[in-house]
Amino acid sequence: MPKTLTKKLNAIKAAGKGIFVPYIMAGDHEKGLDGLAETIHFLEDLGVSAIEVGIPFSDPVADGPVIEEAGLRSLAHGTSTQALVETLKTIETEIPLVIMTYFNPLFQYGVENFVKDLADTAVKGLIIPDLPHEHANFVEPFLADTDIALIPLVSLTTGIERQKELIEGAEGFVYAVAINGVTGKSGNYRADLDKHLAQLHQVADIPVLTGFGVSSQADLERFNAVSDGVIVGSKIVKALHQGEPIQDFIKQAVAYQK
């Protein structure tokens, strides 16, 4: 039986709408983790498809400066993986949450304990950007009987056979990395990006979402045309931190019709 995240996103896709997933850094709020529910409900009220929630880490190899700085602010507020898990247990939302974490915090917490502790929360997906596909067995057995999907990341340099290997049996969605490098580097796209995404979309039987560097209205239109939706991180994180208006951008993304 498909997991909740898969069913939710497939329903949006079937309705002919673009999927929109914003990224936020847990604890990057003037109230620290006490402000997490407020941010989640703000995004939920705007109609987002799911919400990616980052766990701060001191060595975030895939993060650009905006998200790296957000992680440092979160750590300065005292955010820990344990405290985040306890906070997530108290948050009620109909929107699926997807945890984005490097493997080290997960390893320190204990993968089995982490999954068990999140069993009754809104967390329905897990992204581990520094976990190679060959080491997915460190995590997958603990997710097998849960409603949490392990999300595969597929980079631009991935050939068709490798793509098939990475996404075989995957749940939730495929995270298509739009740029070579860290998050937030908008516009630095390869010439064959659209071809790559169309190819990936053809071999995947779950939604394909494009992320890394997506930040403009033009990006929304481009990537919704060749994939099932977008993930936006740095633009959202920066706006929330600086108190900049972001509602119109989110509403445009949520309302995108195929």
UniProtKB/Swiss-Prot annotation:
Entry annotated with the keyword RNA-binding: no
Entry's EC annotation: 4.2.1.20
Signal peptide: none
Keywords from the named record: Amino-acid biosynthesis, Aromatic amino acid biosynthesis, Lyase, Tryptophan biosynthesis
Pathway membership, UniProt: Amino-acid biosynthesis; L-tryptophan biosynthesis; L-tryptophan from chorismate: step 5/5
Catalysed transformations (reactions): (1S,2R)-1-C-(indol-3-yl)glycerol 3-phosphate + L-serine = D-glyceraldehyde 3-phosphate + L-tryptophan + H2O
InterPro entries to which the protein is assigned, alphabetical: Aldolase_TIM, RibuloseP-bd_barrel, Trp_synthase_alpha_AS, Trp_synthase_suA
Gene3D superfamilies in alphabetical order: Aldolase class I
Molecular function via GO: tryptophan synthase activity
GO cellular component assignments: cytosol
Pfam families, per the entry: Trp_syntA
Active site per the UniProt annotation: 52 (proton acceptor), 63 (proton acceptor)
Record-stated family: Belongs to the TrpA family.
Subunit structure: Tetramer of two alpha and two beta chains.
General function of this protein: The alpha subunit is responsible for the aldol cleavage of indoleglycerol phosphate to indole and glyceraldehyde 3-phosphate.
Name the UniProt record assigns to this protein: Tryptophan synthase alpha chain
